[in-house]
Amino acid sequence: MKELYPGDQGIWVQYLQLALQRAGQQVMLDGIFGPKTCAAVEEVLGSSGKCAVKEAQWNRLLPFLRGYITHEVKAGDTFFPIAKMYDTTMERVMHANPGTDAGALQIGSTVVVPLNFPLVSGEVPYTSLLTGWIIEGLQARYPYLQVGTIGRSVMGTPLWSLQLGNGPVEVGYNASFHANESITTPVLLKFAERLLEAYADERMYEELYPERLFEEYSLYLVPLVNPDGVDLVNGLLTEGFYYRRAVRIASGFPDIPFPDGWKANIQGVDLNLQFPAGWDMAKKIKFEQGYNRPAPRDYVGQTPLSA
């Protein structure tokens, strides 16, 4: 976690501000660590005169980004007072702890407590970091959500997959093939969140009953296909070998703004042009346009499925 101080700017500050908002503070998500953000940090963390956000402070704020906290059961605890203690609902606590006898909790055991706000935000840029927090939070809130990976990115980031349902008909959805189109990631995650919530509440979602949907279909969601590229565009990746190489690649295409115009993966290959179908035609077209080498966009790669 990055240490933050007054005067800092960027994506990390926006995530700090999102956590503070969810903790009840009135701060803008402007990515500027100014006086109001400083005051909110002091209010939430009880650290008057100390605005620095280091590892210990992040650990206290992370539940507001992951959307849940864990509670160690004490004598006399039941779901209702636990929910009240964390200003959430008993229904949320019950959904996160299936099979647990709410009236006979074991002292010393752990209860997952979802906090009382929607987990998927549409107000901040997405990165591999935020996506990972959200997926962790969704699985904590809805333990029947199946989470896995389909591989790793060039930089080693997990390519997460979510499975909703166990039906015979398999359907796949994905998001953020292009690095500067990361708005698709929260769209897909919000779809998953709303569908899981409707299933837990035993109510309809968009004129469908999720229980029936999950019996007939297996939905596979890959919410962040290009995490390295997204991290570059949205300001999480700002240094190191891969960043410097991206800068060198971009320097050969001065008409494409950097990093905002970057669509490719971190190696300069456009993942959306990596499919075997029509690859030779795409290669001919893009090479004629000058994208015949690693580029911020439109380079098809050396062969299909090679990136």
Question: What role is predicted for each listed range?
Answer:
Residues 168, 182-186, 190-307:
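Active-site/substrate-binding loop(s) of hydrolase catalytic cores
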Residues 1-18, 28-35, 63-87, 109, ...:
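Primarily a LysM-type cell-wall glycan-binding module
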Residues 160-169, 176:
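Short beta-strand-to-loop junctions in surface cap/lid or active-site-entrance loops
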Residues 17, 41, 93:
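Conserved hydrophobic/aromatic packing and binding residues within compact polymer-binding modules
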Residues 35-38, 55:
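Short, well-ordered surface patches within globular domains
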Residues 3, 81, 92, 112-155:
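Short glycine- and acidic-rich boundary segments immediately preceding or forming the N-terminal edge
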Residues 47-50, 55-72, 113-126:
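Intrinsically disordered, low-complexity Ser/Thr-rich linker and spacer segments
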